[in-house]
Amino acid sequence: MVTSRYYIFDLFGTLITGSGAEIMYAEALNGLFPGLKHWNVNQYINTKDLGSAEMCISKALEYFNITATSEQLKKFEEIINSWKKEVHMYDEVEEVITGLKKRGAKLGMITNDSNIIAGFIEKFGLEKYFDVIISSYKVGMAKPDPRIYELCVEKLGAQMSEVIMIGDKLDRDVEPPNKLGMRGILYDPEQKNAYYPDRISNLKELLD
């Protein structure tokens, strides 16, 4: 049974589709700027508020001393916008989060995102359900930095031992919270990590 007064959720790949954002970044950046280490760019844009999508990638490339043409920036934005159209909220999400709220639970969210892919929380109306929402680019740090989990727990008014975090990535949503004293639960709908003991394949299991 999964019960708590406090829950923290990941966003992409847990509440909404789009866990492939970093793969999409990599393909887009490697295609347009061969040799660029996309992971460094991800880390940079995920921890800074840089404005529009085009401005965001432009500043990131400038930071890494790479000159981009207007055509390259336009193409990158087209790739991002095409990807955005495919993102949707998982069917069971509203039932689960409303069910938890009815039980008196306080809900938090921690998401590694940037100006480039911001806006999905508002698009799907998720903000009304969550007591605390932490976006990496707004606070200048990203998962798995321990401080971002500590910030969310503090804002929830909870103790580490009282909190359950649910997400689809072991290295960001499960193992770091466990080390801090929370309970990290892996959301694994495709059962890719069947060996992992503390996991769920459907968010509705949180209501069991």
Predicted regions and their residues:
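Asp-based, Mg2+/Mn2+-dependent phosphohydrolase catalytic module
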Residues: 1-7, 17, 69-71, 94, ...
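N-terminal helical cap/lid subdomain that shapes the substrate entry/recognition surface
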Residues: 2-95, 99-103
